Curated annotation (Swiss-Prot):
Self-association and partners: Homodimer.
Protein's gene: hemE
UniProt-recorded name of the protein: Uroporphyrinogen decarboxylase
HAMAP family the UniProt entry points to: URO_D (MF_00218)
InterPro entries: UROD/MetE-like_sf (IPR038071), Uroporphyrinogen_deCO2ase_HemE (IPR006361), Uroporphyrinogen_deCOase (IPR000257)
Domain of life: Bacteria
Lineage: Bacteria, Bacillati, Cyanobacteriota, Cyanophyceae, Synechococcales
Species of the source: Synechococcus sp. (strain RCC307)
The entry's keywords: Cytoplasm, Decarboxylase, Lyase, Porphyrin biosynthesis
Listed Pfam families: URO-D
EC number: 4.1.1.37
């Protein structure tokens, strides 16, 4: 086991590294047969993600198979909700279901402050075990959902195509929505601090549905609360790198760069060179290979990785997909992605 700090952590902190570190969003999941076999045995997603033995085992599956530079906690962005008094389930093929969607002020005011050590001790246990297992051979990543995206789920009650319910709240009862978003910002910051204290070395905030907002509404309902989370976490953990990801972020990329995070994770609809040009140079970039490319050939994967790394040259860069890996992706192409990422400098030359 190496004594040097892991590659991804060094890169995230801005050190000169020999190659871009590589991991994949949703790298533990349905494209892996070993995961599907475990899912058949334990069909409840909440059991898989909240039983510490199962969560740890699933988190380690891609590490054991592919040795990525990052090992991310197997969990869900909705996992902290019950600790605030919001029950949920995740139905296979349907996605999240909120049992009692939040639609009035009384429900917002009844939400509890999040105390992760009491309501989610399994998260801390898994992160600690991951750190012990991978040592300095990989970086342990934690993650959360951002306030707007959590609010979208709990107000809509499920995934949505047009977000009409939460947008109605935003434009008819904005004070109520701001109260909900503020509660989530404070709770999510508490949750991130807990993850870092438990072993997470780098953390990512997913605002998956902020791309559904106009730039002006992003400035009103998403960015201030992303910024609040970052500020609260940085007060106590200033040296922990933070990554922000939004799906469909092309219209708000510059705005993302003003939230205080250290890295912007680009989706694949933004050319890496364009993304780098649009963001301040002090910010790192993550991404951004189209996950659909992993249905192609290993050669196509190599070519795209080479192109992505070339375009990010001169920046702090973490190689990743532009979205989570898709179910049904050939497992051997997941392996090809990691192999091509680790050998990219042999093909394009020079240090990053």
């Amino acid at each position: 086991m190496s004594d040097a700090l892991p590659l991804l952590l060094r890169a995230a902190r801005g050190e000169q590294v020999e190659r871009p570190p590589v991991w994949m969003m949703r790298q533990a999941g349905r494209y892996m047969k070993i995961y599907r076999d475990l899912r058949d045995k334990y069909p409840s997603f909440r059991e898989r993600s909240e039983n510490p033995d199962l969560s740890y085992e699933i988190s380690m599956q891609p590490y054991n198979a592919f040795q990525p530079d990052g090992v991310i906690l197997f969990s869900d962005i909705l996992t902290p909700l019950p600790g605030m008094g919001i029950d949920f389930d995740i139905i296979e093929s349907k996605g999240p279901q909120i049992n009692d969607p939040i639609r009035n002020l009384a429900q917002v005011e009844a939400l509890r402050p999040l105390v992760p050590a009491e309501t989610m001790p399994f998260v801390g246990e898994v992160l600690g075990r991951l750190r012990s297992s991978v040592g300095n051979n990989a970086t342990v990543l934690g993650f959360v959902g951002a306030p707007w995206t959590l609010a979208a789920y709990v107000v809509e009650g499920k995934s949505s195509k047009n977000y009409a319910v939460i947008k109605a709240m935003a434009f008819r009862e904005p004070e109520m929505l701001h109260k909900l978003l503020n509660h989530f910002a404070e709770s999510i910051a508490t949750y991130l601090r807990y993850q870092i204290d438990s072993g997470a070395q780098v953390v990512q905030m997913f605002d998956s549905w902020a791309g559904e907002l106009s730039p002006a509404d992003y400035d009103t309902f998403a960015a201030p609360y992303q910024r609040k989370v970052v500020e609260l976490v940085k007060q106590t953990h200033p040296d922990t790198p933070m990554i922000l990801y939004i799906s469909g972020s092309a219209g708000v990329l510059e705005r993302m760069g003003r939230t205080g995070v250290d890295f912007i994770s680009l989706d694949w609809t933004v050319d890496m060179a364009d993304g780098c040009a649009r963001l301040p140079h002090h910010l790192g970039v993550q991404g951004n290979v189209d996950p659909g490319l992993l249905f192609g050939t290993p050669e196509a994967i190599r070519v795209r990785i080479d192109d992505t790394v070339r375009k990010a040259r001169g920046r702090r860069h973490i190689l990743n997909l532009g979205h989570g890996i898709l179910p049904g992706t050939p497992e051997e192409n997941g392996a090809a992605f990691f192999e091509a990422g680790k050998t990219v400098m042999d093909r394009i030359g020079a240090r990053v």
